[in-house]
Amino acid sequence: MSPSSHKPLILACGLPLSGHIMPVLSLVHGLTDDGYEATVVTGRAFEQKVRDVGADFVPLEGNADFDDHTLDDLVPGRKDMAPSFDRTVQDVEHMMVATLPEQFAAIQRAFKKLSASGRPVVLVSEVLFFGAHPISLGAPGFKPAGWICLGVLPLLIRSDHTLGLDNDRSPEAHAKKLAMNHALEHQIFVKATAKHKEICRELGCTEDPKFIWEHSYIAADKFLQLCPPSLEFSRDHLPSNFKFAGSTPKHRTQFTPPSWWGDVLSAKRVIMVTQGTFAVSYKHLIVPTLEALKDEPDTLTVAILGRRGAKLPDDVVVPENARVIDYFNYDALLPHVDALVYNGGYGGLQHSLSHSVPVVIAGDSEDKPMVASRAEAAGVAIDLKTGLPTVEQIKEAVDSIIGNPKFHEASKKVQMELESHNSLKILEESIEEIASHDFGLLTKSDEETEDIPVKGPALAVSS
């Protein structure tokens, strides 16, 4: 559809990591197809993908311009750290908080460009793009008509009863979670929280932000969680701006089948294995999965390496019943798949279940344990509770998924639930609601500035 001058403009933002920006781009693709004009702020590694969905591109600068494969350069000592909570804390401080000024500056550059139209601009960001926070806190600069935040991770907002870990509502669990809630803000993320407040003040904010993990949930005009209710633990007192929106829309893409595509179509059983794009060491999961399934009768294993040009190590022998490809269209393969073995990314779970495919999860970094616990509670997964599963663990889990119809039945229910939530429609309704209210056109705050400076001191996060 041709762009419409009657629609509000869209400014979308996301961390330059596949699991964060790709869900945003999927929705932007739908918006541009429906006649919206969109601009996207993210890292240069994703510029072509931004342009491919019909959007204009504004790059992040400086340390904010990282990607999936350069994080070890951004976070001191990261490459020598095993996946752990300590590494997550370091990632938050350096990847999300310290880069906030550069993110905010990029948003302001984009707003300045869009302001000439005189049309309302709606800001759409993902939950960990903290550069959107100062806009809700009185910082000087251009303001959008409103802010919509997208939940591309399991819910991070705290609750007296869940903490996002399980559905246990016993008195003992309640006390434990209250203590953990306090520890998250006042011990574990105390340095990141302090730096977050300091940076916001340096940028001219007139209010302090909420707790670092929760500000986006509370301050956004609309918060759209990209999952169905069944993939979250029950919660008390969710904010009034919160809504479950289902998974991101599917888009038709050109598909050129590989030479072995006939093997997929003729196989009695197809198992897909991938490790995504972020935490990638193929000997952690892909290689043991190939080994675990090499003698399974009537089974074809398809391994997707997740990056164009990627290859398995030279010493890996690919079994006869396996096919390995660097990059592949999930939507083309998943309709033929009986089970997915992967490392627990949030988007991968949604993608798999949109095709009613149950999963085996082997992940212990980032948000992957949270994803796995939700998937297992929903009955659509087996959580191996490790990022380094043995061949035997993988084989037993795949056999259980294939041999017990309850997993496919539960996956089908979630698929139907996902289909009942049209995320693009929900987003467009939210955009139009915001644009139709009397928020005014894109304006500057009282303290007008031509350019928002990136202050040097705010970029330094002490070790």
UniProtKB/Swiss-Prot annotation:
Matches recorded under SUPFAM superfamilies: UDP-Glycosyltransferase/glycogen phosphorylase
Gene Ontology molecular functions: hexosyltransferase activity; UDP-glycosyltransferase activity
EC class of the enzyme, as a word: transferase
Keyword Transport found: no
Known EC number: 2.4.1.-
Homology family: Belongs to the UDP-glycosyltransferase family.
Record organism: Starmerella bombicola
Catalytic activity: 18-hydroxy-(9Z)-octadecenoate + UDP-alpha-D-glucose = (9Z)-18-hydroxyoctadec-9-enoate 18-O-beta-D-glucoside + UDP + H(+); 17-hydroxy-(9Z)-octadecenoate + UDP-alpha-D-glucose = (9Z)-17-hydroxyoctadec-9-enoate 17-O-beta-D-glucoside + UDP + H(+)
Keywords attached to this entry: Glycosyltransferase, Transferase
Identification of the protein by name: UDP-glucosyltransferase A1
Family annotation (CDD domains): GT1_Gtf-like (cd03784)
UniProt induction comment: Induced in early stationary phase (at protein level).
Function, in words: Catalyzes the first glycosylation step of sophorolipid biosynthesis, the coupling of glucose to a hydroxylated fatty acid to give rise to a glucolipid. Can glycosylate all hydroxyl fatty acids generated by cytochrome P450 monooxygenases CYP52M1, CYP52N1 and CYP52E3 into their corresponding glucolipids. Main products are 17-O- and 18-O-(beta-D-glucopyranosyl)-octadecenoic acids.
